[in-house]
C-alpha cells in the first residue's frame, strides 16, 4: 500500500459562495447507488445550456480546456450546503477531484467528503482570497497538499489547515471504515469475550 503523504494537483477556481448539492449534481441523476459514472453530471446545469447535455456553456470554467486536468477545486463559503446527497461527493471524485478548498462547508457534505477520502480543507476568508489571487495570475497553477504536516503549499505561501486525526490516518493509509474495523478485529474479539452474551446479537 502506498502511503499518501502529499498530493499535488492543478487548481480550478470557482469564485461562488453557497454552491449547494443540487448544483453539484442535479436530482435527476441520483438513480444509482454505486459511486461510478457520476462525473459526467457534475455541475450539469452550469456546464450545459440544455437538458440533453449537447449545448456546452463555453462561459463555465469547467469547460475551459486549460483546466481539463484540474484535481483541486478552490471555492467560497458554504460549499456543499443543501440536501445530504452523498452523490455530490461521488460526482466530484468521479470527475477527478481529490481536494476541495473553501472557507466553510455544509456539515453533512464535509463528513461525506472525509468518509470518501475527498479532502475538504477549510481556510480563513483572507487566505482564500490570497489563493484566488494566485489562480487569477497563473493559469493551471498547482498547489501541493502536505497531509503529513497539514499544510497547503501555494507559490510562496504555506497555510496550515485542520483535519480530524482519524480521518487523516484513513486517507493517508487509504482505509475505509470497514478496513479500519478489520484492522482492530483481534481487539474487538477480545472485548466481546469480556462482556455478557446477551449484549452481543448472535
UniProtKB/Swiss-Prot annotation:
Signal peptide: none annotated. It catalyses: (2R,3S)-3-isopropylmalate = (2S)-2-isopropylmalate. Pathway: Amino-acid biosynthesis; L-leucine biosynthesis; L-leucine from 3-methyl-2-oxobutanoate: step 2/4. It comes from the Bacteria. The keyword Transferase does not apply. Keywords: Amino-acid biosynthesis, Branched-chain amino acid biosynthesis, Leucine biosynthesis, Lyase. GO terms for molecular function: 3-isopropylmalate dehydratase activity. Belongs to the LeuD family. LeuD type 1 subfamily. Catalyzes the isomerization between 2-isopropylmalate and 3-isopropylmalate, via the formation of 2-isopropylmaleate. Heterodimer of LeuC and LeuD. This is 3-isopropylmalate dehydratase small subunit. The lineage of its organism: Bacteria, Pseudomonadati, Pseudomonadota, Gammaproteobacteria, Enterobacterales. The gene is leuD.
Amino acid at each position: 500500500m502506498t502511503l499518501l503523504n502529499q498530493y499535488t494537483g492543478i487548481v480550478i477556481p470557482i469564485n461562488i459562495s453557497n454552491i449547494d448539492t443540487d448544483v453539484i449534481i442535479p436530482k435527476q441523476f441520483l438513480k444509482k447507488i454505486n459511486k461510478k459514472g457520476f462525473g459526467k453530471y457534475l455541475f450539469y446545469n452550469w456546464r450545459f445550456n440544455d437538458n440533453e447535455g449537447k449545448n456546452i456553456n463555453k462561459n463555465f470554467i469547467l469547460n475551459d480546456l486549460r483546466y481539463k486536468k484540474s484535481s483541486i477545486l478552490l471555492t467560497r463559503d458554504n460549499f456543499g450546503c443543501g440536501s445530504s446527497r452523498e452523490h455530490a461527493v461521488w460526482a466530484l471524485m468521479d470527475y477527478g477531484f481529490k481536494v476541495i478548498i473553501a472557507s466553510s462547508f455544509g456539515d453533512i457534505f464535509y463528513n461525506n467528503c472525509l468518509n470518501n477520502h475527498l479532502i475538504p480543507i477549510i481556510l480563513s476568508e483572507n487566505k482564500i482570497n490570497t489563493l484566488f489571487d494566485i489562480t487569477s495570475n497563473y493559469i493551471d497553477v498547482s498547489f501541493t497538499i502536505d497531509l503529513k504536516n497539514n499544510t497547503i503549499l501555494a507559490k510562496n505561501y504555506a497555510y496550515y489547515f485542520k483535519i480530524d486525526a482519524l480521518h487523516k490516518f484513513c486517507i493517508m493509509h487509504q482505509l475505509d471504515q470497514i478496513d479500519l474495523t478489520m484492522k482492530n478485529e483481534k481487539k474487538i474479539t477480545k472485548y466481546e469475550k469480556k462482556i455478557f452474551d446477551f449484549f452481543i446479537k448472535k
